[in-house]
């Protein structure tokens, strides 16, 4: 009854107005799963590869080739297979593609099918997706990393670091966490406006003011947390995504907004200073994706007290993660389904992290859709943290709203991760 009977892919638009792939998977019993694929702006060199059309249409970003791959070659390979055999289906698609980075058929094609298959199987089983994927023990609601000031590749301003986030660790539940984040977000808007900064938002819904340095952004956030009635370092903590690969040039970190260039050790020292001065509990991509020595130095320096998240470093790839674990580099992995290109490989990366006592943070991309699957996956994996943007833009809020629904469905079983994520 859960055999795949039809697959239909189409080209839709993401939150940046760029084309992306949406896939519908139909099963023998009439169940249907629909998934839309996200896309990143700051992408790691080691990520699985999206298939784009090139040419003039959509300025080269069309995905008709990926859509055609789904509707023909992929359907021919997995049509008739049981949707409940997720690993088998993902393996068939990976082998059909035949490249190490899914570049022939496109990670966007393979991922769209992979996620839609899981959604269809969940519907056929009569279970919500988080329960279907995670089983009976899936019940942890994640602490959100809320990106309220954007810089770097996500905004047109001088700030070098890409994301400045708040984490409402002191909330009692996900509803309170969202409320607390919203209150700080709107307080920050007033603070920025009062000092003459624009309050336009970036790709992920955070503000993109013309600030020049990380401390300047952090000071605004600290003040806004306090003005909203919360205590930095108790109710709310801070997190950074430096996206350092974006400004790692010729072996050095070029902070153009701050007007200085740092050697890897000096960059690590700078991050350590920020973590000591502010209640920062998580730093993502503090060093460049191939600066393994810099990562090791940073980990040795502050890894015992600070979550050090590898995004471009690990690209949701279990093999790269195992390299990092062996070298004692970082202590957490950012999990983005489209970096690796299938659901089963995504879940394997989370499992690999947890077995090594690394944390995992479920994450969106800067180019998102209304699809809220990462909310379900964050609960399914009990990873305890989610990164899905700010408290504006419906493509971001879709995930927060889904978490609120999941918490309601779980009832008394629901547990908010809260202070359990703190390292020290």
From Swiss-Prot:
Q: Which InterPro entries match?
A: Enolase (IPR000941), Enolase-like_C_sf (IPR036849), Enolase-like_N (IPR029017), Enolase_C (IPR020810), Enolase_CS (IPR020809), Enolase_N (IPR020811)
User: What general EC class does the enzyme of this chain belong to?
Assistant: lyase
Assigned keywords, A-Z:
Cytoplasm, Glycolysis, Lyase, Magnesium, Metal-binding, Secreted
The answer to whether UniProt assigns keyword Metal-binding to this entry is yes
Residues involved in Mg(2+) binding: 241, 284, 311
Keyword Magnesium set for record: yes
Q: Which residues form the signal peptide?
A: none
Q: Which residues form the active site?
A: 204 (proton donor), 336 (proton acceptor)
Which positions bind (2R)-2-phosphoglycerate? 162, 336, 365-366, 387
What function does the entry list?
A: Catalyzes the reversible conversion of 2-phosphoglycerate (2-PG) into phosphoenolpyruvate (PEP). It is essential for the degradation of carbohydrates via glycolysis.
What NCBIfam families does this protein's entry cite? Answer: eno
Name of the protein: Enolase
Q: Which organism is it from?
A: Allorhizobium ampelinum (strain ATCC BAA-846 / DSM 112012 / S4) (Agrobacterium vitis (strain S4))
Q: What gene is it encoded by?
A: eno
């Amino acid at each position: 009854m859960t055999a795949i009977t039809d697959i239909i892919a189409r080209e839709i638009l993401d939150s940046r107005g760029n084309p992306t792939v949406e896939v519908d998977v139909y099963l023998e019993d009439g169940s249907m799963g629909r998934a839309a694929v996200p896309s990143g702006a700051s992408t790691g060199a080691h990520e699985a590869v999206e298939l784009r059309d090139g040419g003039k249409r959509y300025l080269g970003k069309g995905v008709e080739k990926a859509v055609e791959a789904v509707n023909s070659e992929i359907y021919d390979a997995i049509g008739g297979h049981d949707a409940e055999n997720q690993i088998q289906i993902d393996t068939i698609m990976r082998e059909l593609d035949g490249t190490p980075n899914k570049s022939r058929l496109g990670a966007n094609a393979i991922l769209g099918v992979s996620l839609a298959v899981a959604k269809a199987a969940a519907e056929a089983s009569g279970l919500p997706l988080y329960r279907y994927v995670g089983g009976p023990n899936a019940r942890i609601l994640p602490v959100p990393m809320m990106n309220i000031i954007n810089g770097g590749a996500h905004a047109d301003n001088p700030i070098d670091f890409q994301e400045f986030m708040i984490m409402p660790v002191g909330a009692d539940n996900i509803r309170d966490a969202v409320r607390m984040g919203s209150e700080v977000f709107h307080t920050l808007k007033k603070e920025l406006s009062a000092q003459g900064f624009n309050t336009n938002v970036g790709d992920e819904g955070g503000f993109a003011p013309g600030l020049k340095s990380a401390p300047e952004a952090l000071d605004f956030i600290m003040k806004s947390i306090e003005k909203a009635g919360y205590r930095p370092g108790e109710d709310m903590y801070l997190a950074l995504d430096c996206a350092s690969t974006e400004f790692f040039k010729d072996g050095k970190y070029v902070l153009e907004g701050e007007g200085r260039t740092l050697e890897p050790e000096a960059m690590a020292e700078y991050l350590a200073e920020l973590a000591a001065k502010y209640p920062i509990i998580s730093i993502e991509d503090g060093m460049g994706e191939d600066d393994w020595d810099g990562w090791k130095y940073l980990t040795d320096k502050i890894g015992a007290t600070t979550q050090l998240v590898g995004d471009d470093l690990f690209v949701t790839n279990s093999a790269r993660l195992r390299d990092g674990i062996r070298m004692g580099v970082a202590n957490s992995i950012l999990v983005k389904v489209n970096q690796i290109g299938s659901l089963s490989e995504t879940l394997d990366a989370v499992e690999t992290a947890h077995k090594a006592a690394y944390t995992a943070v479920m994450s969106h991309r800067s180019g998102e859709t209304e699809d809220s699957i990462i909310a379900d996956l964050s609960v399914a994996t009990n990873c305890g943290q989610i990164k899905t943007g700010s408290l504006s833009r419906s493509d971001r809020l879709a995930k927060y709203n889904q978490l609120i629904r999941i918490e309601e469905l779980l009832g008394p079983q629901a547990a908010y991760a809260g202070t359990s994520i703190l390292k020290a």
